[in-house]
From Swiss-Prot:
Belongs to the ATPase alpha/beta chains family. SMART domains: AAA. The gene is atpD. ATP binds at G168, G169, A170, G171, V172, G173, K174, T175. It holds the Pfam family ATP-synt_VA_C. This is ATP synthase subunit beta. F-type ATPases have 2 components, CF(1) - the catalytic core - and CF(0) - the membrane proton channel. CF(1) has five subunits: alpha(3), beta(3), gamma(1), delta(1), epsilon(1). CF(0) has three main subunits: a(1), b(2) and c(9-12). The alpha and beta chains form an alternating ring which encloses part of the gamma chain. CF(1) is attached to CF(0) by a central stalk formed by the gamma and epsilon chains, while a peripheral stalk is formed by the delta and b chains. It is found in: Cell membrane. InterPro entries: AAA+_ATPase (IPR003593), ATP-synt_VA_C (IPR055190), ATP_synth_F1_bsu (IPR005722), ATPase_alpha/beta_chains (IPR050053), ATPase_F1/V1/A1_a/bsu_N (IPR004100), ATPase_F1/V1/A1_a/bsu_N_sf (IPR036121), ATPase_F1/V1/A1_a/bsu_nucl-bd (IPR000194), ATPase_F1/V1_b/a_C (IPR024034). Keywords: ATP synthesis, ATP-binding, Cell membrane, CF(1), Hydrogen ion transport, Ion transport, Membrane, Nucleotide-binding, Translocase, Transport. Produces ATP from ADP in the presence of a proton gradient across the membrane. The catalytic sites are hosted primarily by the beta subunits.
Amino acid sequence: MTVTTSSPATAPGRTPGIGRVARVIGPVVDVEFAPDELPEIYQALQVDRTIGDETLTLTLEVAQHIGDNTVRAISMQQTDGLVRGAPVHDTGAPISVPVGDATKGHVFNVLGTPLDVKQIEAETYWPIHRSAPAFDQLESKTEMFTTGIKVIDLLAPYVRGGKIGLFGGAGVGKTVIIQEMIRRVAKEFGGVSVFAGVGERTREGNDLFLEMTEAGVIEDTALVFGQMDEPPGTRLRVALGALTMAEYFRDVQKQDVLLFIDNIFRFTQAGSEVSTLLGRMPSAVGYQPTLADEMGVLQERITSTRGHSITSLQAIYVPADDLTDPAPATTFTHLDATTVLDRAISDLGIYPAVSPLDSNSRILDARYLGQEHYDTAREVQRILQRYKDLQDIIAILGIDELSEEDKILVNRARRIQRFLSQPFFVAEQFTGIPGKFVPLDETIDSFKRLTQGDFDHLPEQAFFMCGGIEDAEKNAENL
């Protein structure tokens, strides 16, 4: 498939020049220009390559000026068939992607070319390299982003315009949470979502697109993919392309946007590959010396401006489970909240399988949430932590060997654990249980009364897969 794009704008005051390919080493291409026609850093270049009878257009991005009127560029596609001396056209602008309503419901590559249809009718294109909002444009107050998901709102609340790290292995419900968040932003808040597949397996991206189509959330979502088999330049820039689409929805259409990045580690990994290709001296553990800078350029654009926000949910792979590795360690400094999915919880059939003890948020504080919310959350965590501490004793000696106080606490903890489950709208077709949106006030009140023992008389099973506490009481009547 030909993946071509034309830059919609030319830098003012300069006529784009034509150069020629001087050297090709994998995805790195050196291009010579006339002295007065040298393109700027991040400028997009285009060159044709021929494979058999087919001619395809490559897009390159200028990365370095190396002297002798030569620039070093990184290709966004495979360079097979590219020859020395081939003419290279300076587009006069950075790589640009379509923005606006035309992007909803479609899948794009890093160049803004649609992958699910032949073309789209986009009126506006924005360059992927943009400045972060000015300091005086930022939203100064810290505000909670209510999801309607009990376990998240109570124990690891999200920040509007913040960055959330999503930790989860295969099969624990990460994709379902992503789909549910997309659906809730669209239906409950009238917002839009943008998904960036960075270093995704092609199969996973295809599955996500089909599942989102079946779940009915694709109409409010734009997807941008740079698959695992594509050159590092593509994987390094695809997150910026998705972020640019999200910025348009925030700044021009004045919408609240949810931005998903899966996986942020692949962004760092691609940057390391590009850095090596450009001949830079590596830093710790072989990562690029510009690691913190590249991460900051991406993360600082994800923020709230006056009244509108981009809230980011980022899947994070931790190499060898080493949290001190420079890649995840650099990401952690930007996160406002972490949501940890636990396989042990999913094995119990409790979904969402969010760990109430491992997940956290910087705004889980009485100053931001109020004293009642904070005290309720801490009491829930205290009870669940005590239950966890007693697990070994229960397994060896049995629950009858516990003190009366601990028996009450264990039974209460099991009710809380099951009440943290919740039916999702996007899973309704599989579970047969209607999805539930639980208001924050109801969540706090329900768990406060649970910790005080107001519902100790209800059977454990009544709390499983229900929304508010009224659902649990109805379930108890039907048991």
